[in-house]
């Protein structure tokens, strides 16, 4: 289309909010800190309950199933399983609300 209303590259490019294909080092740093913060909260709850001589099934299950930040591979810290992706992995920053959702466990072999 020519004239005053012709297409420009940004207008014909699709989504306005583009997501880069890889996370920046600052996003990775914040992700590691979030994982450590959750680990600290779980440890604090576990210690407080241990002082009282009590246990909670949810905390025990979390400890049994979820790895800590130090135990996780970088692949698991920064990517998640997605069956629609070519290599079955996509960056965790492409997940909606990725800063609020705990994504620590992926299917075995992926």
Swiss-Prot record:
UniProt entry tagged with the keyword Mitochondrion: yes
Pfam families: L31
Main location: mitochondrion
GO CC terms in record: mitochondrial large ribosomal subunit
Superkingdom of source: Eukaryota
GO-annotated molecular function: structural constituent of ribosome
Subcellular location: Mitochondrion
Record keywords, A-Z: Mitochondrion, Ribonucleoprotein, Ribosomal protein
Purpose of the protein: Component of the mitochondrial ribosome (mitoribosome), a dedicated translation machinery responsible for the synthesis of mitochondrial genome-encoded proteins, including at least some of the essential transmembrane subunits of the mitochondrial respiratory chain. The mitoribosomes are attached to the mitochondrial inner membrane and translation products are cotranslationally integrated into the membrane.
Assembly and oligomerization: Component of the mitochondrial large ribosomal subunit (mt-LSU). Mature N.crassa 74S mitochondrial ribosomes consist of a small (37S) and a large (54S) subunit. The 37S small subunit contains a 16S ribosomal RNA (16S mt-rRNA) and 32 different proteins. The 54S large subunit contains a 23S rRNA (23S mt-rRNA) and 42 different proteins.
Family: Belongs to the mitochondrion-specific ribosomal protein mL60 family.
Protein name from the UniProt record: Large ribosomal subunit protein mL60
Organism the protein comes from: Neurospora crassa (strain ATCC 24698 / 74-OR23-1A / CBS 708.71 / DSM 1257 / FGSC 987)
Gene name as annotated: mrpl31
């Amino acid at each position: 289309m020519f004239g005053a209303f012709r297409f420009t590259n940004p207008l014909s490019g699709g989504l306005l909010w583009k997501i880069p294909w890889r996370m920046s080092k600052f996003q990775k740093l914040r992700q590691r800190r979030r994982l450590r913060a959750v680990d600290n909260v779980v440890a604090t709850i576990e210690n407080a309950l241990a002082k009282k001589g009590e246990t909670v099934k949810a905390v025990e299950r979390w400890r049994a199933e979820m790895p800590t930040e130090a135990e996780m591979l970088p692949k698991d810290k920064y990517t998640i399983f997605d069956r629609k992706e070519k290599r079955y992995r996509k960056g965790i920053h492409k997940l909606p609300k990725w800063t609020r959702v705990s994504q620590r466990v992926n299917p075995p072999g992926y």
